[in-house]
Amino acid sequence: ERSIGMENHQPILFLRLEGPLQSWGERARWNHRDTAYMPTKSGVIGLIACAMGLGRGDGRILELDRAVRIAVRADRPGLLMTDYHTVIGIIRTADGKQRGRKGQESTILSYRQYLQDAIFLVAITGEGNIIERIRKALMDPVWPIYLGRKSCVPSRPVLLEVSNEYASLEDAMNRYPRCERSEESIVYEIEAEQNGYVRRDIVTAAPGRLYGERRVELKPAKGE
């Protein structure tokens, strides 16, 4: 963890999300488990909630989501991988009835997508003392941290530093040192007021895994 800078800007917390596999579900349904091309806000909030020891349904997760803004930069986008799972046996439907013909086995093919060998830089800013609370939780997490799914373990500590050297999230995305040297152009995703496109990755109080919408823009990182 690097030291805090001396400039008088709002503190920004930086994460490095790196591992053999990551999966940030955005439109997962039943036997199809997709991954977004970058970490979702709900996924990042879930990672922080694990560090804080907040269980699913805890109202403080919703408060956490509302208190922070994030931006994500793809320093190494990774390769998309699809893992196929076959389940054979007596399979029950949601209402407890046997799927298929009585006494006969059924087969379900499921699809799970992952990003291989990706590296993402996440910048987080927030209200009050929320950044310091997140930093302390990530320094000594209550529960294990994972990259979207519990099977996706980070290959290094995710916390980089808290810095006040950057004027904004956009400034941080453009100037923060890249996690990996590359001649290829890199992009970042940042929240937008009106332009851009919609992502459904805002934590809500609705029952089940229902998410709200936010607008984001995809921009090329300038670098230094």
Predicted regions and their residues:
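Internal, well-folded beta-alpha domain core
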Residues: 73-224
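Glycine/small-residue-rich interface belts in oligomeric ring/scaffold proteins
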Residues: 26-95
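Short, Lys/Arg-enriched N-terminal segments with co-localized hydrophobic residues
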Residues: 1-5
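Membrane-targeting and insertion segments and their boundary/processing signals
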Residues: 15-22, 42, 103-108
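A short linear-motif detector with a strong N-terminal bias
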Residues: 15-16, 49-53, 99-104
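N-terminal, Lys/Arg- and Ser/Thr-rich interaction peptides
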Residues: 6-29
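Extracellular structured ligand-interaction cores
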Residues: 12, 67-69, 117-121
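Solvent-exposed loop and beta-edge segments used for protein-protein assembly and interaction
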Residues: 7-9, 64-66, 114-116
